[in-house]
């Protein structure tokens, strides 16, 4: 989840994803096997959606691609308070740069340079992705 800009991570490290057993003959999907370009093609639209819905304060839309473990871990009251009171979380710029991808286990971490429309400077965005029930889901997201 996007932190309120004080270097504090609201949604922590990803918990191991519950894995649905693949159908007989189907291989298990593992996002780390994708190329950087394939990962960015998935991650960047998800990051842009997080930025958009954070700016609009639409928590339901913001959380729609969260893994079940991340969705359970986030208190909607705290998230609502963050959206209402964080100048950074409500004023994120569309201007981003991807900085790199880290692969670990069954997750990838995509790093972005994020800017604000109201605050000078740059922030580090972190988006953790993996598969859950055959779909790419967000297992962690933060800005610091």
Whereabouts are the PLM-identified features?
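Short, low-complexity N-terminal intrinsically disordered segments enriched in polar/charged residues
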Residues: 2-56
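Generic detector of low-complexity/intrinsically disordered segments
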Residues: 3-4, 94, 129
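Arginine residue identity/basic-tract feature
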Residues: 8, 19, 28, 48, ...
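Short, charge-rich amphipathic segments
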Residues: 13-20, 57-63, 90-94, 116-122
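Short secondary-structure boundary micro-motifs
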Residues: 34-38, 83-86, 97-99, 110-114, ...
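Conserved short hydrophobic patches within well-ordered secondary structure
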Residues: 42, 79-80, 127, 141
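Short solvent-exposed beta->alpha transition segments
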Residues: 44-45, 49-55, 59-107
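Exposed beta-sheet edge and beta->alpha loop/turn motif
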Residues: 100-144
């Amino acid at each position: 989840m996007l932190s309120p800009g004080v270097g504090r991570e609201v949604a922590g490290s990803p918990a191991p994803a519950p894995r649905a057993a693949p159908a007989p003959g189907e291989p298990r999907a593992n996002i780390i096997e994708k190329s950087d370009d394939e990962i960015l093609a998935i991650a960047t639209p998800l990051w842009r959606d997080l930025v958009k819905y954070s700016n609009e304060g639409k928590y339901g839309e913001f959380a729609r691609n969260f893994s079940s473990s991340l969705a359970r871990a986030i208190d909607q009251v705290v998230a609502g308070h963050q959206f209402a009171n964080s100048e950074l979380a409500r004023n994120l710029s569309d201007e981003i740069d991807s900085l790199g991808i880290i692969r670990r286990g069954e997750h990838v971490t995509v790093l972005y340079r994020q800017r604000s429309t109201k605050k000078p400077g740059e922030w580090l965005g972190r988006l953790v992705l993996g598969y859950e029930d055959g779909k790419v889901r967000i297992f962690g997201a933060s800005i610091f």
